[in-house]
């Protein structure tokens, strides 16, 4: 795989970032510093970089939306890459509070999801299930045939710094409450736009690099070429004006029912129906209980249908079985945090289509597995029923043992809220590397994940002596305390040790 340096050279980054390529009217002298500049820069970056497109929630389409976790990822990368607050480590929780402030100041708003006619409390959620929309973009939910695409930065350029009229004092209070102080102007880096190709290459290289540190892989070919082997789930393009009217009405009935229920279980199940074929959805609608308030019958119908569909289709994560084995091995050895990070990295490498379908299914599995929820089978625990029904929908490979598959599936269910987040360490590494490219430095020097620590010659010499001494003392202690050795044998070994390492012997036993 080509290195980032080679990719950057091929794309002529130095020319891309020359003064001639800067935006019209750009001038360092014109740039404001401090709290106001940081705030405006965050808004501009969020509006131009977060993925805004048509999304679905409970089978209802919402135009021009982005998800909460992606907003946090964009702002986190922006703050760490540009070092607005110096070298201070910024935890993800503080970025979430920044997003809450952006929502409080009407930069963006939550896409309203009504439950019995009431709006949910406008609290920002770092989740891939929460939808938001910029307030500068008109609501277009009622338009049909709108393309599901990412909008260009120009769409927001005129509104980038007009989202809210906020005084500098208020912004300074905001950063102070977060224990963050904007660095002085010489340390603030003027961000220049990098090619998406370079950014994606950096993300992929660093994600794979870190994954290789956590998981022992015998072969790298499958990992490096994983984009070619990801199974593509059969997806039918269902636009309102292109589907059979009867099928669309059946989906509409289920959507209306879901919108009327204040039930997380039913909402999660209906979200999964998006991936079921039309005929299965028609069957669900036609067999719907005559008493809609019998939610137990509704849940039984939905669970059986979703389970039946995923038992017959291609597993979502069936490729890269060696990674699955590696993650399961970490779990067996009790290294849960490392297993979680490895899972986050693995899912970061997935294509967006598979990732979204897997997110919905895993969310439904986690809700259905809750022991306080609807009893799926009288004599079985919900958690075990869900594992048994959906394990093969996630991983079904003869190279992964059943025990490891079960362990991995249960782990995914228990951590479904965290597995789709990007590790903070990866964010920081990528930001540092992108900053090096922007400044024209070698991106591979002193950046990225490394497998050993660089030290100078004198430090190496002293470190070697200390390590050797520590190991010799440990060996001497083992000989001295070994009760299995006879007195004659122990005396002989101690004599040999004293002859070859008198200083260590004296230090251990004294004069």
Curated annotation (Swiss-Prot):
The UniProt entry's sequence similarity note says:
Belongs to the DEPDC7 family.
Tissue specificity comment: Strongly expressed in liver and to a lower extent in kidney.
Q: What is this protein called?
A: DEP domain-containing protein 7
Domain of life, per UniProt, equals Eukaryota
Write out the GO biological process terms. Answer: intracellular signal transduction
PROSITE patterns per the record? DEP (PS50186)
Q: Which residues form the DEP domain?
A: 46-136
Organism encoding this protein: Mus musculus (Mouse)
């Amino acid at each position: 795989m080509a290195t980032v340096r080679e990719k950057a050279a091929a794309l002529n980054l130095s020319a891309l970032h020359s003064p001639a390529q800067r935006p019209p009217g750009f001038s360092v002298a014109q740039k404001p510093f401090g709290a106001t500049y940081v705030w405006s820069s965050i808004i501009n970056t969020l509006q131009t970089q977060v993925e805004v497109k048509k999304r679905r929630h409970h089978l209802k389409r919402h135009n021009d939306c982005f998800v909460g976790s992606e907003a946090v990822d964009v702002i986190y990368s922006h703050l760490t890459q540009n070092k607005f607050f110096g070298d201070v480590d910024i935890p993800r929780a503080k970025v979430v509070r920044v997003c809450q402030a952006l929502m409080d100041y009407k930069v963006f708003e939550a896409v309203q999801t009504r439950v019995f006619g009431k709006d949910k409390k406008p609290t920002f959620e770092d989740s891939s299930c929460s939808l938001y929309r910029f307030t500068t973009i008109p609501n277009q939910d009622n338009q049909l045939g709108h393309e599901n695409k990412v909008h260009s930065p120009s769409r927001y350029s005129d509104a980038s710094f007009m989202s809210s009229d906020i005084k500098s004092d208020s912004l300074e209070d905001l950063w102070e409450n977060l224990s963050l102080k904007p660095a002085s102007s010489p340390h603030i880096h003027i961000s220049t736009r990098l090619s998406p190709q370079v950014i994606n290459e950096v993300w992929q290289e660093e994600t794979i690099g870190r994954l290789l540190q956590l998981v022992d892989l015998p072969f790298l070919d499958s990992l490096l070429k994983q984009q070619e082997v990801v199974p593509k789930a059969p997806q039918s393009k269902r636009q309102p004006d292109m589907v059979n009217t009867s099928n669309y009405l059946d989906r509409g009935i289920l959507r209306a029912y879901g919108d009327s229920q204040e039930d997380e279980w039913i909402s999660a199940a209906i979200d999964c129906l998006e991936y079921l074929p039309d005929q299965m959805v028609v069957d669900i609608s036609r067999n719907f209980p005559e008493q809609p308030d019998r939610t137990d019958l509704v849940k039984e119908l939905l669970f059986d249908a979703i389970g039946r569909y995923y038992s017959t289709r291609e597993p979502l994560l069936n490729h890269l079985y060696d990674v699955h084995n590696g993650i399961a091995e970490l779990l067996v050895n009790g290294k849960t945090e490392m297993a979680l990070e490895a899972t986050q990295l693995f899912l970061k490498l997935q294509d967006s289509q598979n990732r979204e379908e897997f997110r919905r299914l895993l969310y439904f599995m986690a809700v259905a597995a809750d022991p306080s929820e609807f009893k799926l089978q009288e004599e079985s625990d919900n958690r075990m029923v869900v594992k048994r029904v959906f394990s093969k929908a996630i991983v079904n490979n003869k190279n992964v043992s059943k025990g490891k598959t079960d362990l991995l599936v249960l782990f995914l269910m228990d951590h479904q809220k965290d597995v789709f987040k990007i590790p903070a360490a990866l964010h920081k590494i990528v930001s540092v590397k992108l900053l090096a490219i922007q400044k024209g430095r070698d991106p591979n020097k002193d950046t990225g994940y490394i497998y050993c620590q660089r030290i100078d010659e004198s430090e190496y010499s002293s470190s070697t002596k200390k390590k050797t001494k520590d190991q010799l003392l440990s060996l001497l202690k083992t000989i001295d305390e070994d009760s299995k050795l006879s007195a004659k044998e122990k005396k002989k070994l101690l004599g040999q040790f004293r002859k070859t390492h008198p200083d260590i012997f004296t230090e251990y036993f004294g004069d």
